[in-house]
Amino acid sequence: MNTATGFIVLLVLATVLGCIEAGESHVREDAMGRARRGACTPTGQPCPYNESCCSGSCQEQLNENGHTVKRCV
């Protein structure tokens, strides 16, 4: 095998591996996105937004340090 043939083989291999990796990362991104959208915050846990609570309700409460935090109720 001469240098040109070796170079072409490596180029094809890199292209195939790049396409496979690009496809896998796209699938992982979709799966992670679906998991994030499907998850909700359980009761008693801090909630940055009302829509992230499983109950759909977020309320300000005092924590153990006396600070006001929003928690799912």
Swiss-Prot record:
The keyword Signal applies. Residues 23-37 form a propeptide. It is found in: Secreted. InterPro entries: Omega-atracotox. One of its GO terms (cellular component) is extracellular region. GO terms for molecular function: calcium channel inhibitor activity; sodium channel regulator activity; toxin activity. It holds the Pfam family Omega-toxin. Expressed by the venom gland. Residues 1-22 form the signal peptide. The record marks P46, N63, R71 as: Critical for insecticidal activity. Keywords: Calcium channel impairing toxin, Cleavage on pair of basic residues, Disulfide bond, Ion channel impairing toxin, Knottin, Neurotoxin, Secreted, Signal, Toxin, Voltage-gated calcium channel impairing toxin, Voltage-gated sodium channel impairing toxin. Disulfide bonds join C40-C54, C47-C58, C53-C72. The keyword Transport does not apply. Its main location: secreted. GO terms for biological process: defense response. The presence of a 'disulfide through disulfide knot' structurally defines this protein as a knottin. Insecticidal toxin that reversibly and voltage-independently blocks both mid-low- (M-LVA) and high-voltage-activated (HVA) calcium channels (Cav) in cockroach DUM neurons. Also causes a modest block of insect sodium channel currents (Nav). Induces potent excitatory symptoms, followed by flaccid paralysis leading to death in house crickets. This toxin comes from a female specimen. It is observed that propeptide sequences coming from female specimen have only limited homology with the male paralogs, but the reason is unknown. Belongs to the neurotoxin 08 (Shiva) family. 01 (omega toxin) subfamily. This is Omega-hexatoxin-Ar1b. It comes from Atrax robustus.
